[in-house]
């Protein structure tokens, strides 16, 4: 029996289709998750070692501009541009309908770094002030801030990963120059992650279980 063979050229062709032409129709329902789709497409080409070869500097700059167009003025990134009211029409009342999300923010950061951007246009302080507002009392993180600043969605380890990754990219190990910006509660986050560990030495994706004896 012949083993499976990785078809690199076919993968490259698929990613380029997603990047430069219309997305497959099965992705239509995921329009609000375009940042996620962009991440997997660009990261896929980068992992295959052809991102620089198969895209021009002008194209890569265009992708960077699209990412920044998804940046929310109060910090973080939205999943796509469809909820953007524009600077003149955005108000504290309607901002709840155009929220930044933790996954989109993390993916935006990684895409920008992959494309060679210096992150100088990222609203660093605003994003780092927004991040702790999404942390729950148990240490986990939500997805977005809803009406009244209520934390919505998330709660599992994926969102913990997105939050920690975003924090590291923007704050670094020491947080130099950001001493006046409130940090997330790292000990609580660690406790939540540890509480998700089960006796089989794996981690449950959702809520914590009883601590290991």
Regions found by a protein language model. Give the residues of each.
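Preference for long, amphipathic alpha-helical scaffolds in soluble/luminal domains
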Residues: 1-213
